[in-house]
Amino acid sequence: MAAKDVKFGNDARVKMLRGVNVLADAVKVTLGPKGRNVVLDKSFGAPVITKDGVSVAREIELEDKFENMGAQMVKEVASKANDAAGDGTTTATVLAQSIVNEGLKAVAAGMNPMDLKRGIDKAVIAAVEELKKLSVPCSDSKAIAQVGTISANADETVGTLIAEAMAKVGKEGVITVEEGSGLQDELDVVEGMQFDRGYLSPYFVNKPETGAVELESPFILLADKKISNIREMLPVLEAVAKAGKPLLIIAEDVEGEALATLVVNTMRGIVKIAAVKAPGFGDRRKAMLRDIAILTAGTVISEEIGLELEKATLEDMGQAKRVVITKDTTTIIDGEGDKALIDSRVTQINQQRDEATSDYDREKLQERVAKLAGGVAVIKVGAATEVEMKEKKARVEDALHATRAAVEEGVVAGGGVALIRVANRIAELRGDNEDQNVGIKVARRAMEAPLRQIVANAGEEPSVIANKVKAGEGNTGYNAATEEYGNMIDMGILDPTKVTRSALQYAASIAGLMITTECMVTDLPKEDKPDLGGAGGMGGMGGMM
């Protein structure tokens, strides 16, 4: 085992604090409407320019191992805030830096670190309750656009695009961000249920100009099995031909003579047919087939529940207004399913999502909800260069997370004002002893830090403006973009309650642990062993050949 380097007490805390400040100082220059960019060098490709706090934090590794420990702990604050709310990483870092700096000053002055931490925790619990009281619901498109605009660093087009996307696919809908091909940002909405499976044979194509299959008011046969024998299909095909409607077959697979017969029927014009593989694999495929069945008012033909393909009737078929199939995707538009049954299915999947343990499962369940609830929106980010594209895409993703958080828990006044108001509201809070009271003061002082940093980044004097804002009431604050005072909500400067809450809780949690640190242990750097030097020739052997 490698030898260790151990530091105690003040020596350890000074080193740790230096690391905290290096990382936090790099991150906090990005805060607010007049925050600056940070350029990150990459081992390959062009440097990345970003205003995203967590992206900056993730890049920082310090040479001194004790300083690096401090930096890594603050990095954890930014990452946790990002995971919980998708935004607020810079605010969380600024809060953590303030708590650690003020807290360690108090420890150096002889306060008990454990009581300090208890005081900080008490203040944060009280502050979160007050934040919830200040929170107002965020339901209309205007408020959603404002939240998106603020989070995307005052880019109004991004806020408007996100609000449009949410209006079209619902607040539960899936909205994804992709790199576009032009200079303009675009919104592409896929209505209905779309899944990643295309037609099984190009002979099904009936729109050669687009290379797609379009079926108007088709019957939809859902089978949880491979279909290779055409005899199983004959009763269904005859019934559909009599009804004079097209047929879409969604099965585990359609192969061999069954597929050949379907192609021949289509080419001869006897009946319009298209076949696609069912989406997903294993249990997820079964669940998605059931989703499609509920959406289209059909039944999944499965031997597990005693249903056989030969005995299937038109009553077992699902129906939709229109189906469009390309070589890669199938889209079912306006299924005939009962609204109440669809809502019940959405509730059931949401419950599964809340209980899911892995991010992958949660994401897949959320996609299923969106497909049932109304569709998928894709925001295509436009930019002139790849460097700008990456920076802008990161901002749009942040803005999207922020708007989701706003819809979930509501909004509070932005620009650091909500935390100032909360700090005033808990002014009378007291701990069990004087050291805890100092901890409460440390937390309250930290709640001013985001506003002070926003003002400093705008080139103004933080103390003057912070005192003016503190003297105000309600949502009155300072708009750093226009350099004027006013009602932050009316000016459209909003922060999602969830983002502010998460930033405060994670900052206090990790900063509190750092204040109570008494010892730090790390590996000693390995010393390079000296080279053995060139091995000399063996003496006395020169005459040998």
Curated annotation (Swiss-Prot):
Q: Which UniProt keywords apply?
A: ATP-binding, Chaperone, Cytoplasm, Isomerase, Nucleotide-binding
Q: Per the record, GO CC terms?
A: cytoplasm
- InterPro entries assigned: Chaperonin_Cpn60_CS, Cpn60/GroEL, Cpn60/GroEL/TCP-1, GroEL-like_apical_dom_sf, GROEL-like_equatorial_sf, TCP-1-like_intermed_sf
- A Pfam family found in this protein is Cpn60_TCP1
Region annotation (Disordered) maps to 526-545
Q: Which EC number(s) are documented for this chain?
A: 5.6.1.7
One GO BP: protein refolding
Which spans does this entry mark as compositional bias, Gly residues? 533-545
CDD domains the UniProt entry points to = GroEL (cd03344)
Reaction(s) this enzyme catalyzes, per UniProt: ATP + H2O + a folded polypeptide = ADP + phosphate + an unfolded polypeptide
Localization (cell): Cytoplasm
Subunit comment: Forms a cylinder of 14 subunits composed of two heptameric rings stacked back-to-back. Interacts with the co-chaperonin GroES.
Role summary:
Together with its co-chaperonin GroES, plays an essential role in assisting protein folding. The GroEL-GroES system forms a nano-cage that allows encapsulation of the non-native substrate proteins and provides a physical environment optimized to promote and accelerate protein folding.
Family in the record = Belongs to the chaperonin (HSP60) family.
| The protein's name | Chaperonin GroEL
Organism of origin is Sodalis glossinidius
